[in-house]
Amino acid sequence: MSTITVVIADHKKSGRAACLSVLKLERGIQVAGEVRSGLEAMAVAAKLKPRILLFHLNLFKGKKINLLRALRQKSPKTKVILITLRTPENQILDALTHGARGYIQEKDISTFLPKAVRLVDAGEAWVPRKMVAKIIDRLAHLTA
Protein backbone atom coordinates (compact mmCIF):
# COMPACT_ATOMS: atom_id res chain seq x y z
CA MET A 1 0.00 0.00 0.00
CA SER A 2 1.56 3.30 -1.05
CA THR A 3 1.39 6.48 0.97
CA ILE A 4 -1.58 8.78 0.34
CA THR A 5 -0.26 12.30 -0.14
CA VAL A 6 -2.50 15.15 0.99
CA VAL A 7 -2.43 18.92 0.58
CA ILE A 8 -4.53 21.00 2.96
CA ALA A 9 -6.01 24.24 1.58
CA ASP A 10 -7.78 26.36 4.18
CA HIS A 11 -7.84 30.11 4.69
CA LYS A 12 -7.69 29.64 8.47
CA LYS A 13 -4.55 28.48 10.23
CA SER A 14 -6.74 26.73 12.81
CA GLY A 15 -8.47 24.76 10.06
CA ARG A 16 -5.18 23.61 8.55
CA ALA A 17 -3.90 22.72 12.03
CA ALA A 18 -7.02 20.65 12.80
CA CYS A 19 -6.58 18.57 9.64
CA LEU A 20 -2.84 18.22 10.18
CA SER A 21 -3.19 17.12 13.81
CA VAL A 22 -5.55 14.31 12.81
CA LEU A 23 -3.71 13.15 9.68
CA LYS A 24 -0.17 13.19 11.10
CA LEU A 25 -1.16 10.35 13.43
CA GLU A 26 -2.30 8.15 10.55
CA ARG A 27 -0.08 5.48 9.08
CA GLY A 28 -0.09 5.58 5.27
CA ILE A 29 -1.14 9.23 5.01
CA GLN A 30 1.38 12.04 4.54
CA VAL A 31 0.57 15.75 4.52
CA ALA A 32 2.70 17.07 1.65
CA GLY A 33 1.74 20.72 2.01
CA GLU A 34 -0.51 23.40 3.44
CA VAL A 35 -1.81 26.49 1.60
CA ARG A 36 -4.10 29.45 2.35
CA SER A 37 -5.71 30.29 -0.99
CA GLY A 38 -7.26 28.78 -4.09
CA LEU A 39 -4.41 30.03 -6.28
CA GLU A 40 -1.83 28.52 -3.94
CA ALA A 41 -3.77 25.26 -3.97
CA MET A 42 -3.68 25.11 -7.77
CA ALA A 43 0.06 25.86 -7.86
CA VAL A 44 0.91 23.29 -5.19
CA ALA A 45 -1.37 20.65 -6.73
CA ALA A 46 0.30 21.18 -10.12
CA LYS A 47 3.76 20.85 -8.56
CA LEU A 48 3.26 18.08 -5.99
CA LYS A 49 0.40 16.12 -7.63
CA PRO A 50 -1.10 15.02 -4.29
CA ARG A 51 -3.55 12.17 -4.33
CA ILE A 52 -5.97 14.15 -2.13
CA LEU A 53 -6.60 17.88 -1.86
CA LEU A 54 -8.56 18.98 1.20
CA PHE A 55 -10.11 22.26 0.08
CA HIS A 56 -12.12 24.60 2.29
CA LEU A 57 -15.24 25.68 0.43
CA ASN A 58 -14.72 29.33 1.47
CA LEU A 59 -11.64 29.48 -0.78
CA PHE A 60 -13.87 29.29 -3.84
CA LYS A 61 -15.42 32.73 -3.34
CA GLY A 62 -18.03 32.14 -6.03
CA LYS A 63 -15.59 30.56 -8.51
CA LYS A 64 -15.99 26.90 -7.60
CA ILE A 65 -16.62 25.63 -11.10
CA ASN A 66 -13.59 27.39 -12.57
CA LEU A 67 -11.31 26.35 -9.70
CA LEU A 68 -12.40 22.71 -9.85
CA ARG A 69 -11.84 22.65 -13.62
CA ALA A 70 -8.43 24.26 -13.25
CA LEU A 71 -7.45 21.83 -10.51
CA ARG A 72 -8.48 18.87 -12.69
CA GLN A 73 -6.41 20.23 -15.59
CA LYS A 74 -3.31 20.88 -13.50
CA SER A 75 -3.46 17.66 -11.52
CA PRO A 76 -6.06 15.30 -13.05
CA LYS A 77 -5.44 12.43 -10.63
CA THR A 78 -5.84 14.59 -7.51
CA LYS A 79 -9.17 13.99 -5.79
CA VAL A 80 -10.80 16.90 -3.99
CA ILE A 81 -12.55 16.65 -0.63
CA LEU A 82 -14.30 19.84 0.43
CA ILE A 83 -14.22 21.09 3.99
CA THR A 84 -17.17 23.19 5.09
CA LEU A 85 -18.60 24.79 8.20
CA ARG A 86 -22.22 25.47 7.27
CA THR A 87 -22.70 25.69 3.54
CA PRO A 88 -25.99 25.65 1.65
CA GLU A 89 -26.62 22.21 0.18
CA ASN A 90 -26.97 23.61 -3.33
CA GLN A 91 -23.38 24.90 -3.20
CA ILE A 92 -22.13 21.51 -2.05
CA LEU A 93 -24.13 19.78 -4.79
CA ASP A 94 -22.67 22.18 -7.38
CA ALA A 95 -19.14 21.38 -6.23
CA LEU A 96 -19.82 17.63 -6.30
CA THR A 97 -21.32 17.98 -9.77
CA HIS A 98 -18.15 19.71 -10.97
CA GLY A 99 -15.58 17.27 -9.71
CA ALA A 100 -15.29 17.25 -5.93
CA ARG A 101 -15.30 13.67 -4.64
CA GLY A 102 -16.71 14.39 -1.23
CA TYR A 103 -17.13 16.82 1.59
CA ILE A 104 -16.71 16.83 5.32
CA GLN A 105 -17.96 19.30 7.88
CA GLU A 106 -15.39 20.95 10.13
CA LYS A 107 -17.05 19.44 13.22
CA ASP A 108 -16.43 15.93 11.83
CA ILE A 109 -12.74 16.29 10.99
CA SER A 110 -11.40 14.57 14.11
CA THR A 111 -13.82 11.67 13.73
CA PHE A 112 -14.03 11.02 10.00
CA LEU A 113 -11.21 12.73 8.09
CA PRO A 114 -8.80 9.76 7.90
CA LYS A 115 -11.58 7.45 6.73
CA ALA A 116 -12.78 10.01 4.17
CA VAL A 117 -9.24 10.41 2.80
CA ARG A 118 -8.74 6.65 2.48
CA LEU A 119 -12.11 5.98 0.86
CA VAL A 120 -11.89 8.85 -1.64
CA ASP A 121 -8.35 7.77 -2.51
CA ALA A 122 -9.73 4.27 -3.16
CA GLY A 123 -12.23 5.68 -5.65
CA GLU A 124 -15.28 6.09 -3.46
CA ALA A 125 -17.18 9.28 -2.64
CA TRP A 126 -17.54 10.71 0.84
CA VAL A 127 -20.88 12.39 1.47
CA PRO A 128 -23.28 12.17 4.40
CA ARG A 129 -26.15 9.76 3.82
CA LYS A 130 -28.70 12.58 3.94
CA MET A 131 -27.11 14.03 0.78
CA VAL A 132 -27.39 10.86 -1.31
CA ALA A 133 -31.07 11.40 -2.21
CA LYS A 134 -30.32 15.01 -3.18
CA ILE A 135 -27.44 13.89 -5.39
CA ILE A 136 -29.69 11.34 -7.09
CA ASP A 137 -32.33 14.03 -7.65
CA ARG A 138 -29.67 16.31 -9.17
CA LEU A 139 -28.51 13.52 -11.48
CA ALA A 140 -32.09 12.83 -12.55
CA HIS A 141 -32.51 16.50 -13.52
CA LEU A 142 -29.24 16.45 -15.48
CA THR A 143 -30.35 13.48 -17.55
CA ALA A 144 -33.96 14.59 -18.03
Language model features: what each stretch is:
Residues 36-52:
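Acidic, metal-coordinating helix/loop segments flanking the phosphotransfer/catalytic sites
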Residues 91-97, 102, 107-144:
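Short, flexible helix-to-coil linker/hinge segments that flank and couple to helix-turn-helix
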Residues 53, 80, 103-104:
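Two-component signal transduction core modules
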Residues 38, 54-68:
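Conserved phosphotransfer microenvironments
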Residues 65-77:
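Short amphipathic alpha-helix used as the core "switch/output" element in two-component signaling
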Residues 2-15, 19-23, 53:
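Conserved acidic segment of CheY-like receiver
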Residues 86-87:
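Short, conserved "switch-loop" micro-motifs in signal-transduction and mechanochemical regulators
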